[in-house]
Every structure is written in C-alpha cells, then in structure tokens.
Amino acid sequence: MQALVNQTQPINESIRDVDITNFGPTNLIIIQPTSYCNLDCDYCYLPDRHLKNHLPLDLLEPIMQAIFASPFTTSNFSLCWHAGEPLAAGLEFYRQAFAKIETYGEKYNHRQLWFDHSFQSNGILINQAWCDLFKQYPVHVGISLDGPAFLHDKHRKTRTGRGSHAATMRGIEWLQKNDICHSVIAVLTEESLDYPDEIFHFFRDHNLLDVGFNMEETEGINTESSLNKQGTLQKYRQFLERFWQLTSTSEPEFRVREFECLCNLIYTEDRLDHTDMNRPFAIVSIDHQGNFSTFDPELLAIKTPQYGDFIFGNVLTDSFASICQTEKFQRIYHDMTQGVEKCRQTCDYFGLCGGGAGSNKFWENGSFNSTETLACRFRIQQVAEVVIGALEESLGLA
C-alpha cells in the first residue's frame, strides 16, 4: 500500500475551539532530567545527547503542580525518567528528587492518584547504591540491551568506541541480585534478523524473560534505518515466526511485548480506536527546562522545517490545557487526526494499530497527515500475520 501523504493544510476555523474533553487520560509522564548520554549508539535519534544539560531540582515543584492540576490527570500514572541516559543525572539528584516529589504529591495530589517511577536506562551506571534507591520507591527499570554481545556492541558503543555489553550486563546483575523489577527493550537492526535463536537463548539463559522489540527506525538524526532494504521484511517475518516457536514452548514463560499486546486484542476481541502516541495528553513529555509536549515522546527534542519544534508550552508559564488553543498545537493535532482518519478508512489493520505513531509518519512520509509506514509494516502487520497464523494453526483452522 502506498503512503497517502498530503501537504500540511491551514487550520480550519471550525477546529479553533478544540474539545479537550476526549484528551487523555494521562497515563505516562516522561521526564528528561538530562540530555546527556554516556553512550553513542549509531541508531539513536537524539541530536543533543553530547550536551550535559540537567534538570534543576527547583523545577520539580512546578512540574508536579502542572501534572496534578491538569484536567487530563484523572487516573494512576507512571513517571518515567528517560532520554539521554537518565542515571547520568546522578544518584544524589534522584535521592533529592524522589523525596521532593513525595512532598509535592502530598501538597498537590488532591485526587489521591497513585503513581510510580520507572527508568529507561542503558544500565551501565547501576550498582548497589542505585539498587538501594530503587528498593526504597516503587521503581521499574527498563534496560536497553540488543541481545548477545556481537549484536549489541555493533551499535551500542561508548564515546571512545568500545562496546557497552559487558557493562550493561553488570548493571543487570545488580538488578537481579536485588530483585528489582526490570525488563528489556532490544532494538532490531538488519543484522539481528539472522539470529532469532541466539537472541532468544541469550535472554532466556540470563533470565531476561520480559522483552520488547523496537525496530531500528528512521527518526530524528537517524535518517535511514538498516531495515529499509529489499528483502528485510521477509527476513523479519521469518525472525518472528522462529521467535514465536521458541517462546511458545519456553519454560519458564518468555514474554514478548509485541506478541502479548496482539494476543490480548485477539482474546478480548477489543480493537483500537487510537494509540497513546496520537491521542493528546495520554503521554506528556517534559525536558530539563520544563518545556513540555505530547503525542510521541521522541518529538520533544526535535526541530523540523515544517513544524518548527514540538514544544507546546513550559510548566513555569503554561498549563497543559491552555496550550490546546494555540495555533501550533492545533496545526499538529489537525494533521495527526487527519492521518489517523485516513488509516481508519484505508487500512485493514487499523483496529490492531489505532492509527500509528505520528513520529514514524513524519520521518518516513514527511507529514503526520499520512498513512502507512515501514514501522507499521514491521511492528503491526507482520506481527499480526505471524501471530494470527500461528493461533489458527494451533486451532486446526489453517
């Protein structure tokens, strides 16, 4: 299917007064405490990961006040510390930050909402002192790990060009020794697709049984994915088929995020009408200066000729609700909504996808107001074909 791309259209007067009652609820707040990362992964989308910008502790009160005052914060949520390498902000920063956030929760959390903390980290800095902090609060740690060293170290290198696999595994050992809740996100590149058995056995042998696969994406400063080549779609399908075989017979249970999400939709007969990445204020991202955005977290640090940056406001001067009437928000929301509607009208997979992620549409097609992407073909369509085919075969329907 060819992507349907339209040029960005002027905002219609009829959408000037945006109905915000269907926005949210906010279930994920991503706080970017530092732009700096101690790795230099070659597929990273972030342009400023060499800069050592840090979130001042004084900004935490207006951040938490904005979160709890928002009309979109009506249910429990997670505070995810992400972008750059969040642990590079330092252990003492989080000791003070978590204590302050508890205080601000008591002051501003009038709805008595429950929230927890999570990190997405490369794991390199984790030691016993970090684990002591993680045990003090309800913390989940996501680790970026691409499988065995020969795959991981090809792309995830230090700033001096050395592989980071051994250091990441040391961090994981600390988490496991302390029974800290953790999971893995693995980026699949062209090379990964030849090694489903090796990746599966590596994770299983190291008791890493909760894994999500991210495709290497065309996004931000990563202007070309290694998966965007002839033949990789078929290789990816073969990878998924083999991984399904391996996980479906695994003891102990091995959970793959992509399989789990699709199976849940099939078993419950639910279908998606949207995703958190195209529904305003389901996700809120806040950077080290208090600037905030919504939709895809990847958009916050990016500047583009078409839209400028994706900063909608700042917690020091704006509420989440107030920016919904600004021209910038309405222009992006309009294009995002039009793209989702086109997906609804043209794609058989819409109920499994909900209209996709705007960042993928923008970076691949040049507009939010567009449809199918490479990311969609890999992440949704191929997974659906493999899982549905395997389930039908198991039921004798194939």
Swiss-Prot record:
<feature type="binding site">
    <location>
        <position position="41"/>
    </location>
    <ligand>
        <name>[4Fe-4S] cluster</name>
    </ligand>
</feature>
<keyword id="KW-0949">S-adenosyl-L-methionine</keyword>
<keyword id="KW-0411">Iron-sulfur</keyword>
<comment type="similarity">
    <text>Belongs to the radical SAM superfamily. Anaerobic sulfatase-maturating enzyme family.</text>
</comment>
<dbReference type="GO" id="GO:0051539">
    <property type="term" value="F:4 iron, 4 sulfur cluster binding"/>
</dbReference>
<protein>
    <recommendedName>
        <fullName>Uncharacterized protein sll1766</fullName>
    </recommendedName>
</protein>
<keyword id="KW-0479">Metal-binding</keyword>
<keyword id="KW-0408">Iron</keyword>
<feature type="binding site">
    <location>
        <position position="37"/>
    </location>
    <ligand>
        <name>[4Fe-4S] cluster</name>
    </ligand>
</feature>
<dbReference type="GO" id="GO:0016491">
    <property type="term" value="F:oxidoreductase activity"/>
</dbReference>
<feature type="binding site">
    <location>
        <position position="44"/>
    </location>
    <ligand>
        <name>[4Fe-4S] cluster</name>
    </ligand>
</feature>
<feature type="domain" description="Radical SAM core">
    <location>
        <begin position="21"/>
        <end position="253"/>
    </location>
</feature>
<dbReference type="InterPro" id="IPR013785">
    <property type="entry name" value="Aldolase_TIM"/>
</dbReference>
<dbReference type="GO" id="GO:0046872">
    <property type="term" value="F:metal ion binding"/>
</dbReference>
<dbReference type="InterPro" id="IPR026357">
    <property type="entry name" value="rSAM_SPASM_GrrM_OscB"/>
</dbReference>
<keyword id="KW-0004">4Fe-4S</keyword>
<dbReference type="InterPro" id="IPR007197">
    <property type="entry name" value="rSAM"/>
</dbReference>
<dbReference type="InterPro" id="IPR023867">
    <property type="entry name" value="Sulphatase_maturase_rSAM"/>
</dbReference>
<dbReference type="Pfam" id="PF04055">
    <property type="entry name" value="Radical_SAM"/>
</dbReference>
